[in-house]
Amino acid sequence: MSEFSIAIPTHDRGENGPKWLKELFESLKVQTFQDFDIVISDQSKNDLILDACKEYSDDFEFTYVRYEGDVPCENINVALKECTGKIIKVMFSDDILVAMDALEILHKEYENGCKWAFSGFCGTKDLSLIHI
């Protein structure tokens, strides 16, 4: 069992979906704390997200689930139900971890008795720019 499960509910975002998901994967690859698995609950109707996951299958331990329903919040629940890590971090396909030690910081707090934490974002992303 991993320390962390990274739960990522996804849906159809056209060509941007896999692009943004790969950016998230790249931010996870450089984390100083690497004891995590990734759970993808994919609500899209095509294989673009699945193909992006396959590209990173040598880098990460994945659980991939195709969610056929049409309720976005249930897609999050599907991802959460598949998590096996001691700590669950929900991320969305257009999120990234900016700090390379983000998971390490969360893990240290967990080890110090923290039972619940949340994180925020520092900007928004459009098709060509990151706004901080």
Q: Model features per residue range: what roles?
A:
Residues 67-83:
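Glycine-rich, basic loop-to-helix element that forms the pyrophosphate-binding segment
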Residues 2-7, 37:
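Cell-envelope/extracellular polymer assembly enzymes that use nucleotide-activated donors
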